Amino acid sequence: MKTLKKSLTLIFIISLFCITAEAKTIQHTVVKGESMWKIAVKYQVGLSEIISANPQVSNPALIYPNQVLNIPLMDESITSFEQQVIDLTNEKRASRGLKPLNANWELSRVARYKSQDMANNKYFSHTSPTYGSPFNMIKNFGIKYRSAGENIAYGQRTPAQVVNSWWNSAGHRANMLNANYSD
């Protein structure tokens, strides 16, 4: 199914608007040969989110051509914030001669779940009472990797503040500059 990535980095962004934003939805008309999984990949949305947005579908494994599905989409301000964090991180990496990190919608999805979990359970830690370690969480979301790291932030209002906070932390800076990470 999923191919083994050369290496991954997992960056978690915590901010008030990321936690409280509501997902917008669009409608998708199923065409022959589609599955909910294929639709999830097409829109870069988790399968579980599509299933949740479509309670009228009694069996998610059976969808039919011309059936209309609701597709939840992320708020553009959230994805823009995340992309800016990646861009600023890549500036730091480039200054050290490292390859840029790629945006990865599946890792971003995991990060949003972790962010929501920290908000719901009122903690700030790399170990989640719900998901365990970041590495277990990545595996449990079906993502294969060879190496991974986690940077978390809380209270920063801008992407620059997030990246500067990480840069001023030895452990987070090491993750930012890890040459083994690609996503």
Regions found by a protein language model. Give the residues of each.
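Extracellular LysM carbohydrate-binding repeats and other cell-envelope/extracellular binding modules
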Residues: 26-29, 38-77
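Sec-dependent N-terminal signal peptides of Gram-positive bacterial secreted proteins and lipoproteins
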Residues: 1-24
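Short acidic, glycine/serine/threonine-rich helix-capping segments at coil-helix boundaries
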Residues: 51-64, 98-107, 125
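A short alpha-helix/helix-coil micro-patch that ends at or immediately precedes a cysteine
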Residues: 78-119
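Disulfide-stabilized extracellular recognition modules
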Residues: 150-183
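Histidine-centered active-site/metal-ligand motif
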Residues: 28, 126, 172
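Short, surface-exposed glycine/acidic/tryptophan-bearing loops
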Residues: 110-157
